[in-house]
Amino acid sequence: MDADKDNIKQACDERSAEMDDMRGEQSMGLVHEIMSENKELDEEIKKLEAELQSDAREFQIKENVPEKKLKLTSVESPKDGCHFSNSSCSFQVSSQILYELQEGQALITFEKEEVAQNVISMGNHVVQMEGTPVKVSAHPVPLNTGVRFQVHVDISKMKINVTGIPDELSEEQTRDKLELSFCKSRNGGGEVESVDYDRKSRSAVITFVETGVVDKILKKKTYPLYMNQKCHSVAVSPCIERCLEKYQVFSAVSKKTVLLTGLEGIPVDEETGEDLLNIHFQRKNNGGGEVEVVKCSLDQSFAAYFKEEARETI
């Protein structure tokens, strides 16, 4: 009888030990699983932080902006709020003007316009080239026509472009699915005002009711679109409108640059010729002044490009 009791007690002790071992193994397994999940979450957090930094860099503009003094005279209160629905900018674009410098010619640019005009008015000049007097003639630089225009850019704060839309449903059903997907706040969406869907290009322009929704959506380049019990990834981008205005064609004569002719066959190379012309036209007693740059063309022709700092003739 006592032996039976001892056997039962021993069996209970062994069972208890087995249970303790099982609990320990389960605990270790649970700890390992939690650690593995934490590691995956840490990697996901790092990935999301990298994406946020990348998106932030895309919206940054690195440019040294000169200081400006501003005087605020009044505060406008637009009634319809349209002034705050777009980010706008405008700038003027002017084409560079090409001039082909032929052999035996040189271009010389002075710091001051009046010096260049004086050199031209004198007509002929005698320049010493390694002991050889060379007669050169000064002329205005005849430039070809150029163009200028203004570019206006409006970036909407209320609209986005959506591309890569699956062509699985009718146009009306697709518009409904777009509206339903982009109104989900958990994905960064908001109340949709309208959906302009183009089936041919598989794209759409979506207009939202509230400001701020577009900024949240554009933090990522894609957005989930739910259609036919599937989740598709569509591309989202800013809605940008561009407009060209005040297109003008003009011809001009450079104000600070002078064309010199008569340099064919001079007994020096181009670099030496440029130095000698620079020295000659630096001197005031030769009708010159401070020189910015000289370019000679003795052996081959060159292409020179002028920016719009010239006087318009038409």
UniProtKB/Swiss-Prot annotation:
Residues 1-24 are annotated as: Disordered. Expressed in macrophages. GO terms for cellular component: cytoplasm; cytosol; extracellular space; membrane; nucleoplasm; nucleus. InterPro entries: Nmi/IFP35_dom, Nmi/IFP35_N, Nucleotide-bd_a/b_plait_sf. Disruption phenotype: Knockout mice show decreased inflammatory response when exposed to infection of injury, which can lead to lower inflammation-induced mortality. Display normal development of the immune system. Residues 104-193, 202-293 form the NID domain. May be ubiquitinated. Its main location: cytoplasm. Pfam families: IFP_35_N, NID. Keywords: Coiled coil, Cytoplasm, Immunity, Innate immunity, Isopeptide bond, Nucleus, Phosphoprotein, Secreted, Ubl conjugation. Residues 31-65 form a coiled coil. Interacts with MYCN and MYC, as well as with other transcription factors with a Zip, HLH or a HLH-Zip motif. Interacts with all STAT proteins except STAT2. Interacts with IRF7, the interaction is direct and leads to the inhibition of IRF7-mediated type I IFN production. Interacts (via coiled-coil domain) with TRIM21 (via the SPRY domain); the interaction leads to 'Lys-63'-linked ubiquitination of NMI. Interacts with IFI35; the interaction is direct and is facilitated by TRIM21. Interacts with TLR4; the interaction is direct and leads to NF-kappa-B activation. Belongs to the NMI family. This is N-myc-interactor. The lineage of its organism: Eukaryota, Metazoa, Chordata, Craniata, Vertebrata.
